[in-house]
Design a protein with these regions (language model features):
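Conserved glycosyltransferase catalytic-site signature
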Residues: 7, 41, 98-100, 118
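Active-site-proximal, substrate-binding regions of enzyme catalytic domains
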Residues: 52-74
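Anion (oxyanion) recognition and catalysis
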Residues: 32, 62, 107
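Active-site neighborhoods of divalent-metal-dependent phosphate/nucleic-acid chemistry enzymes
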Residues: 67-112, 116
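Short, well-structured N-terminal submotif of metal-dependent ribonuclease cores
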Residues: 1-39, 49-59, 131-132, 137
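A general structural signal for well-ordered alpha-helical segments in protein cores
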Residues: 40, 44, 54-57, 76, ...
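Acidic, PIN/NYN-like endoribonuclease modules and their adjacent C-terminal/linker elements
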Residues: 29, 103-137
Length: 137
């Protein structure tokens, strides 16, 4: 079982959010027991902002047993189609392309996505299996 991890889950741990920290840690531990964990390039870039160096970010991911997996051309294309459909349906530009890349990456290169942003992903990636740690309460 491959679990893709969204940035918001990792930020719950890096910038401890008392509301979500325990649930996100438990969900990551559960994902690790179920198989492997990955992040796409976009999540990696968003995560690196919170570290002084690339080495520190890489160590954090290595310690968490999360590997970075590049977005495939197929996933990039799927993200572009989802973005286009979203805009045609009147979707506002409040959603950035990175969100679509994260969803397409998880749909095509993992078995599921661990994220607190389930409404967005459920609507635009209906076949994507989603795990929401806040549902653990």
């Amino acid at each position: 079982m491959i679990t893709a991890i969204d940035t918001n889950i990792l930020l719950d741990i890096l910038a401890p959010d008392p509301e979500f920290l325990d649930d996100s840690v438990a969900a990551l531990e559960e994902a690790a027991r179920a198989g492997s964990m990955i992040v796409c390039d976009q999540v990696y870039a968003e995560l690196c902002v919170h570290f002084a160096s690339r080495r520190e970010c890489d160590e954090f991911l290595r310690d968490a047993e999360i590997r970075v997996e590049a977005l495939s051309a197929e996933a990039s294309f799927a993200a572009s189609r989802a973005w286009r459909a979203y805009r045609k349906q009147g979707g506002q530009r409040t959603r950035i392309l990175a969100d679509f890349l994260i969803g397409a990456h998880a749909q095509l290169q993992a078995d599921r996505l661990l994220s607190r942003d389930r409404g967005f992903y459920r609507k635009l990636f209906p076949s994507l299996k989603l795990l929401d740690p806040s549902g653990r309460r």
